[in-house]
Amino acid sequence: MSTNPHVFSLDVRYHEDASALFAHLGGTTADDAALLESADITTKNGISSLAVLKSSVRITCTGNTVVTQPLTDSGRAVVARLTQQLGQYNTAENTFSFPASDAVDERERLTAPSTIEVLRKLQFESGYSDASLPLLMGGFAFDFLETFETLPAVEESVNTYPDYQFVLAEIVLDINHQDQTAKLAGVSNAPGELEAELNKLSLLIDAALPATEHAYQTTPHDGDTLRVVADIPDAQFRTQINELKENIYNGDIYQVVPARTFTAPCPDAFAAYLQLRATNPSPYMFYIRGLNEGRSYELFGASPESNLKFTAANRELQLYPIAGTRPRGLNPDGSINDELDIRNELDMRTDAKEIAEHTMLVDLARNDLARVSVPASRRVADLLQVDRYSRVMHLVSRVTATLDPELDALDAYRACMNMGTLTGAPKLRAMELLRGVEKRRRGSYGGAVGYLRGNGDMDNCIVIRSAFVQDGVAAVQAGAGVVRDSNPQSEADETLHKAYAVLNAIALAAGSTLEVIR
C-alpha cells in the first residue's frame, strides 16, 4: 500500500436528476454522505450538484475540542498526518483542544489558533491536491460563535447539531448541469482499489436509466394529517417580540431576529427533501447525513441566502443579505395570481419597516467585510432586488469585497459569523438578548452549510428553509426580523410563512395534509 494518497478521477454519464442518482448510489443509507445542489431562481433549472458518496474523516467540533474520526484507511493516514501537524494541541487519540485566546487586539484574536485550524490543515495540507480534492463538506452551527465570544449559557434544543461538523471526502460525484457533464473523483492510499471502486460506481451510474431514476421508495406516514406544533405559541412569541422591542426603544439594539421551532413527524427525510427541491428550487439545496455523539441525524433544506462565498482565483468575498418578506400572490388552487403577486411586491418595496430593516443589514454586511478586506474594495453590487420562491418573495442585495492577502476564507467566516439577517444589529448584543428569550441553542438553524476546497474556495449558505431530523422528528425553525415598528402578530405570521415550504414538503412526502398548532 502506498504511503502517499493517490487521486483518481473518471468522467461518467450525465444524469439530470442528481438527487435520484445520489439515492441510486446508496447516498441515502450511507453514514457521512452529503449532497449539495443549486438551481437558478428564475428558470428553476439545475446549475450544479456535488455529492460526497464516501468520507475518509468525520470532523466534529464541540466547544474548544475537535474530534477527527477516521473512517477509512486513507482517513487514518490523514489523521496521523494531522496529529503531527497539530501535535501541541493533541490531547487524546484523534482529539485536539485549543485554549481560548486572551488577545485584546481584534486581528490577533481573529488569527489566534482555534478549532478552525483543524479544518484549515485538512483543506490545505492533507498531502494531496487535485482540481476536485481535498473537499470538506458540512456545516457550522449558529452556536459556534460561543467558542469565541461570551454568550449566556442555554440548554440543548431538539436541534442537536454540534458546533461544527464536516466530512473529508474520499469519493465525490461532481455534476455540471449547464454543460451536462459529470465526474467521479476519489483519493486513497491504495490506487488499485480506488480505481476499481470508481469503475464500479461508473457502471452503477450507467445502469441508472432515466426511467428508474425516480424509483426511490418512500417511508409512509401513519395517518392522513401531519400535525405540526410550534414550541412557542403565538401569544408567547408576541410577548417575546414586545420584550425585544423594549431593548430597541432603550437603544440596546436596532434590530433583532427571534425564532421558533415547528416540530412534525418525518419518517423519510430524503423524500421530504425531494419534495422541497421540486416545489421550492433554490440556489442552495442540501441533504446531509451525519452522526454526533452516537446519534444519527439528517439535515436538509433549500436556502435562498448565501452565507459567505469566497472565490480564491480573484479573492472576492460575497455576502447576500436577504431581509423583507411577503407571501407570494396565490390563487385558491395554489397557482400564481400575477396581479396579487405584483401587489405584494409593491407593498414590500414601499414598506418603510422592510426598507429600514434591509438597509440596516446591508450596512452590517459592509461592516463585516471591512474587518477582513482590502481597504476601499467593498461595494454594494446589487441593492433591493426581489427574489421569488414558491411561497414567499424577498428583498435581496449583494455586497462584495477583496479578502486581505494575509487571511483565508475560514478567517473571513469567523469574522463575519453569524449573518445579521439571523441575528440583528449590533450582532453580539442581539445574540445575547436572543439567548435570553429563546433559552436554547439554535443548532444548525442560522448557521452555515457548504464546502471548502483545497484551492481555497469556500461557498456556503445560511441554514434556513431547512429541517433537522432525528429519531423520525423534524425540527423546522424560522425567524422574523423585528425593528421598532414591527407588529408582533405579523412577525409571528412571518415565521410560519417562512417555515411553510419545508413543512409542506414533509407533508407531501408523507401523503398527508398539514395541521399547524400555533
Curated annotation (Swiss-Prot):
Binds 1 Mg(2+) ion per subunit. It catalyses: chorismate + L-glutamine = anthranilate + pyruvate + L-glutamate + H(+). Its cofactor is Mg(2+). GO terms for molecular function: anthranilate synthase activity; metal ion binding. This is Anthranilate synthase component 1. Gene3D superfamilies: Anthranilate synthase. Heterotetramer consisting of two non-identical subunits: a beta subunit (TrpG) and a large alpha subunit (TrpE). Its EC number is 4.1.3.27. Part of a heterotetrameric complex that catalyzes the two-step biosynthesis of anthranilate, an intermediate in the biosynthesis of L-tryptophan. In the first step, the glutamine-binding beta subunit (TrpG) of anthranilate synthase (AS) provides the glutamine amidotransferase activity which generates ammonia as a substrate that, along with chorismate, is used in the second step, catalyzed by the large alpha subunit of AS (TrpE) to produce anthranilate. In the absence of TrpG, TrpE can synthesize anthranilate directly from chorismate and high concentrations of ammonia. Keywords: Amino-acid biosynthesis, Aromatic amino acid biosynthesis, Lyase, Magnesium, Metal-binding, Tryptophan biosynthesis. Pathway: Amino-acid biosynthesis; L-tryptophan biosynthesis; L-tryptophan from chorismate: step 1/5. Mg(2+) binds at residues 357, 494. It comes from the Bacteria.
